[in-house]
Amino acid sequence: NVPPTSPSQGNPGGPGRFPPGNTGIYGGGGGGAGGSGGASTPNNVGGAGGSGSSSYPGDSTTRAGGGGGTGGPAGGGAAGSGGGGAGTNYNDPGAAPSANRSGTANTGGGGGSGGRPAGPSDILYGGSGGSGVVIVQFANSVEGNDRISGGTRTTSGCNVVHTFNATGNFVVP
């Protein structure tokens, strides 16, 4: 948010750390729509992803959570609520590679970070971000709203909501 905007357009990631005498760098979690990413911990766990946020008042779905940071042998950072992916962990030589985590589809959640490989031929990529969603909301009192179509149509209080989880057309006759 530089320059600052209202409403907020996201939050910062958490700080990582490089412990003295260690060869690993442990990552902070990625920022989410509703909160900042967490710092990596003194016991070498990656930072948690920042929390997501609901898209409109009355929406019970949380979206756009941050991805977790890379951790030490103790583990990668937790996924941020709202579809973020968990971070991978550093692997000691001979340890099995940890799974890479992608953000949840249709949430816009961030992917978890990659980890240090167990060997020179291992590659531990970070996870992909989750596909996004488009939400169009308008007052139920809008004239002709029953002819407006596209996406999945629901109501929330006195509003009509059209949710698109895939490519589609929003038709206003």
Show which residues each predicted segment covers.
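Low-complexity, glycine/proline-biased repetitive segments and flexible coils/loops
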Residues: N1-P173
